[in-house]
Curated annotation (Swiss-Prot):
Keywords: Membrane, Transmembrane, Transmembrane helix. InterPro entries: Sugar_P_trans_dom (IPR004853), TPT_transporter (IPR050186). The gene is SLC35E2A. It comes from the Eukaryota. One of its GO terms (cellular component) is membrane. This is Solute carrier family 35 member E2A. Belongs to the TPT transporter family. SLC35E subfamily. It holds the Pfam family TPT. Residues 198-207, 218-236 have a biased composition (Basic and acidic residues). One of its GO terms (molecular function) is antiporter activity.
Length: 266
């Protein structure tokens, strides 16, 4: 490529990707699959004395509706569908195992086979819920890792069906709700992640969906990943979660003419 490349002509091809998504009212029924934007970056580097190399980088971004969170239309729709299919799966499994005398291992194998076939179809066929991205290379020991995860998942399904066959549905689901305790323990032992206790309203509401996560708490922070625990809240002050409580105390002290507590250095 010659060095007389017209950079103004290339800059005209760059779509405007700096626009911020506009806010929505709660329970607004917009696009169920999010907003997508593409950003094209052109960079020119000197590859030699008489030749220039033009590098084109295309970045595709999915904008998450962080302003509404769980109250967005898409989140509510998926949550409703998840509750419905979970309810149907649970009681159909109990019906097949208890009344029809089904075998847990065979039922688990059929479910895993169906999941594998449907997952392959969803990966290969274009679908609105998933867009496959080609890989140039795979991580080391990728097949062995996936095989190990598949075997563990099969064992989890079969053991869950065995327990569902021998005990009541309510007791089986109560025991399953304590699974996050072991998740926290394993993540602490293997990954070194630290999990704490909830400290604000949003995280307490999240715990109501799975009571087992509350029992796994051991400090004032919430049992959520660090990226969510230290992220900026969708409402209120634009401060991390750990700074919101001192900021609230500071405002109360100002309104009551009390000695102001010291705020942590930002």
């Amino acid at each position: 490529m010659s060095s007389s490349v017209k950079t103004p002509a290339l800059e005209e091809l760059v779509p405007g990707s700096e626009e911020k998504p506009k806010g929505r009212s709660p329970l607004s029924w917009g696009s169920l699959f999010g907003h997508r934007s593409e950003k094209i970056v052109f960079a020119k580097s000197d590859g030699g004395t008489d030749e220039n190399v033009l590098t084109v980088t295309i970045t595709e971004t999915t904008v998450i509706e962080s302003d509404l969170g769980v109250w967005s239309s898409r989140a509510l729709l998926y949550l409703t569908l998840w509750f419905f299919f979970s309810f149907c799966t649970l009681f159909l499994n109990k019906y097949i195992l208890s009344l029809l005398g089904g075998e847990p291992s065979m039922l688990g194998a059929v479910q895993m086979l169906s999941t594998t076939v449907i997952g392959c179809v969803k990966t290969l066929v274009p679908c609105c819920l998933y867009q496959h991205k080609a890989r140039l290379s795979y991580p080391p020991n990728f097949l062995m890792t996936m095989l190990f995860v598949g075997l563990m998942r099969f064992a989890t399904v079969v053991l869950g069906l065995v327990s569902l066959k021998n005990v009541a549905v309510s007791f089986a689901e109560t025991v399953k709700s304590s699974a996050p305790i072991f998740t926290v323990i394993m993540s602490r032992m293997i990954l070194g992640e630290y999990t704490g206790r909830p400290s604000d309203r949003e995280e307490r509401e999240e715990l109501q969906l799975q009571p087992g996560r509350g029992a796994a708490a051991s400090d004032r922070r919430s049992p959520v990943p660090p990226s969510e625990r230290h992220g900026v809240r969708p409402h209120g002050e634009n401060l991390p979660g750990d700074f919101q409580v001192p900021q609230a105390l500071h405002r109360v002290a100002l309104s009551m003419a009390l000695p102001c507590p010291m705020l942590p250095a930002s």
